[in-house]
């Protein structure tokens, strides 16, 4: 089956004695080789514990019409869903802990336990997370871009040994849209405030996919901010952008209009390629608070 976007392979069985350490990979392509054929992105070898965090989704909820540059904000809420997998063949119990911190202040933290059978996957959900006087994230020109540090830890319930942990910076914001009944056009709101979208187009940082560093991303995304733009449309014919791109957009207050691959030319023989690509893309960056619109190319 064709694979687009990220690719992860479990290698525990294959790298165990006496199996071969060679991995033949065949790329079937019915058209000429293009710039993203083959391995171009980073490759990782991950050593896991008895269990691991597969992915997670943090969803802030900011009600009402908020005012930027205000020191006292009404409380916000959030939900967090964490996918956990037991990698052992036996039943085990695990503790899932998360903390949400702004600078040195802990905004929220909770712990819950889960018991999984051997090889089982399940999701842990934290609902109604209260965030007092939240520091709200705003698009460029409309306000500031404060970020919270979200940390998730997975430990063995018996030994309390750390099995896995993940962290990322997240923004507290609410994005919505509707159709203007007078003009028939779509209008966007951030934290209840209507936003005039001023956007640019992003084909890619480098056609040869070299030097995809945070510094370079910040340089070019920063140019968009200096021009007063607050949105970038990521062209669907490019690559699945690296995390550094979204980090730069976080920093400069740039919303992202994310297009999907293979939506303009669907001649493949496989089933429902657009739906599969949509799922893979959203799993890659499920917590990017600046992603405000998905679309086909």
Regions found by a protein language model. Name each.
Residues 196-199, 231-234, 255-258, 292-296:
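Structural recognition of the beta-strand scaffold that forms the well-ordered cores
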Residues 1-232, 240, 251:
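Secreted/periplasmic carbohydrate-active enzymes, especially glycoside hydrolases
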Residues 157-160, 251-256, 284-289:
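Secondary-structure transition/capping motifs at alpha-helix termini
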Residues 281-297:
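Active-site groove signature of glycoside hydrolases
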Residues 138-147, 255-257, 262-265, 284:
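Acidic/aromatic-lined carbohydrate-recognition and catalytic surfaces
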Residues 179-186, 242-244, 273-286:
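Alpha-helical scaffolding within the catalytic cores
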Residues 221-275:
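Aromatic-lined substrate-binding rim segments of carbohydrate-active enzymes
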């Amino acid at each position: 089956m064709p694979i687009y976007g990220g690719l992860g392979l479990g290698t525990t069985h294959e790298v165990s004695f006496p199996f071969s350490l060679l991995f033949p990979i065949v790329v079937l392509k019915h058209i000429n080789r293009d710039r993203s054929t083959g391995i171009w992105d980073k490759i990782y070898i991950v050593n896991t514990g008895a269990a691991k965090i597969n992915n997670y989704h943090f969803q802030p909820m900011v009600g009402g019409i908020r005012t930027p540059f205000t020191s006292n904000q009404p409380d916000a809420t959030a939900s967090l869903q964490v996918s956990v997998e037991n990698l052992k063949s036996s039943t085990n119990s695990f503790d899932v802990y998360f903390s949400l911190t702004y600078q040195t202040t802990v905004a929220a933290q909770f712990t819950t336990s889960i018991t999984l059978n051997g090889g089982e996957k399940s999701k842990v959900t934290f609902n109604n997370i209260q965030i007092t006087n939240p520091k709200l994230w705003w698009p460029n020109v409309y306000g500031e871009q404060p970020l919270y540090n979200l940390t998730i830890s997975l430990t063995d319930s018996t030994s309390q040994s750390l099995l896995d942990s993940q962290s990322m910076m997240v923004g507290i914001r609410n994005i919505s849209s509707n159709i203007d009944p007078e003009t028939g056009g779509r209008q966007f709101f951030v934290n209840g405030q209507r936003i005039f979208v001023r956007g640019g187009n992003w084909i890619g940082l480098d056609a040869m996919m070299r030097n995809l560093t945070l510094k370079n991303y910040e340089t070019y995304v920063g140019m968009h901010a200096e021009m007063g733009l607050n949105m970038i449309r990521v062209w669907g014919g490019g690559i699945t952008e690296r995390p550094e791109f979204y980090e730069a957009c976080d920093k400069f207050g740039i919303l992202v209009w994310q297009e999907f691959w293979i939506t303009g030319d669907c001649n493949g023989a496989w089933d429902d390629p657009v739906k599969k690509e949509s799922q893979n893309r959203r799993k890659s960056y499920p917590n990017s608070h600046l992603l405000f619109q998905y679309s086909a190319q």
